[in-house]
């Protein structure tokens, strides 16, 4: 079903939430992708909204997830993990890009604000990715529809409290898009979750942090991978 895209300003102000589209739909799409690829289960790593989707998959489809890694995400709880006032203002006043160059320049501007101030800013990389995103879809309908779906899903603290798979939560201490309290709340809500703060990291994945993040994920997923391999051998 192709629903009309919500008004982005109304979404940011707390209105125009299409109840027929939420994180549960995106989680179901994720499981559908696993089915299409022929995977019984997987190690899920989600970033930002992807973290919310991964959390929802782990909560609603526990048998399909080996481990969960949630990065720069939150629980949806009110006043927790929210954007900084300066970020809200930039999002609410941003004019939709009229062409590819405006989209690229806009991405550079926002990521200079929400990015990792503790690491060098790679403008070339941001421009490249923004161009790819524009070429894939030159409208903002998908973005605003997904953002509305996040708001419509509300507080998921109780739901993710039922997650039983090993969980790693990573969050930068300079995040202006999702305040670090979002990561703290996520780790507190999920039983036995491990929380790691990345000093100097904002709401992106700077190249300088990749090594540390990859090591954390590798260490986190290794035990579950060994258990699964052993079970398959015994079967």
Model segments located where?
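Short glycine-enriched nucleophile-adjacent loop
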Residues: 51-62, 68
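Acidic catalytic loop of the alpha/beta-hydrolase fold
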Residues: 174-178
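Flexible "cap/lid" loop of the alpha/beta hydrolase fold
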Residues: 67-98
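Active-site nucleophile elbow and catalytic-triad environment of alpha/beta-hydrolase enzymes
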Residues: 142-159
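Catalytic active-site module of serine/aspartate enzymes centered on a nucleophile-bearing elbow/loop
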Residues: 193-235
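Short beta-strand/loop motif that positions the catalytic acidic residue
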Residues: 163, 169-171
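Conserved acidic catalytic loop of the alpha/beta-hydrolase fold
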Residues: 24-42
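Conserved alpha/beta-hydrolase catalytic His-Asp/Glu region
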Residues: 101-144
């Amino acid at each position: 079903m192709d629903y009309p895209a919500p008004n982005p300003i109304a979404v940011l102000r707390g209105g125009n939430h299409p109840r027929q589209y939420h994180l549960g739909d995106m989680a179901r799409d994720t499981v559908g992708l696993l089915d299409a690829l022929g995977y019984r289960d997987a190690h899920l790593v989600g970033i930002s909204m992807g973290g919310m989707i991964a959390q929802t998959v782990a909560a609603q489809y526990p048998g399909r997830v080996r481990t969960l890694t949630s990065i720069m995400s939150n629980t949806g709880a009110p006043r927790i993990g929210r954007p900084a006032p300066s970020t809200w203002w930039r999002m609410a006043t941003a004019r939709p890009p009229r062409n590819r160059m405006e989209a690229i320049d806009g991405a550079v501007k926002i990521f200079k604000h929400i990015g990792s101030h503790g690491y060098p800013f790679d403008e070339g990389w941001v421009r490249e990715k923004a161009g790819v995103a524009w070429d894939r879809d030159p409208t903002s309908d998908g973005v605003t529809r997904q953002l509305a779906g996040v708001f419509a899903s509300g507080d998921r603290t109780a739901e993710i409290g039922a997650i039983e798979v090993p969980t790693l939560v990573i969050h930068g201490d300079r995040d202006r898009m999702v305040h670090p309290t979002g990561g703290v709340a996520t780790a507190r809500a999920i039983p036995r979750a491990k929380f790691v703060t990345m000093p100097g990291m904002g709401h992106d994945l700077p190249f300088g942090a990749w090594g540390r993040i990859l090591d954390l994920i590798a260490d986190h997923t290794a035990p579950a991978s060994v258990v699964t391999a052993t079970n398959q051998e015994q079967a």
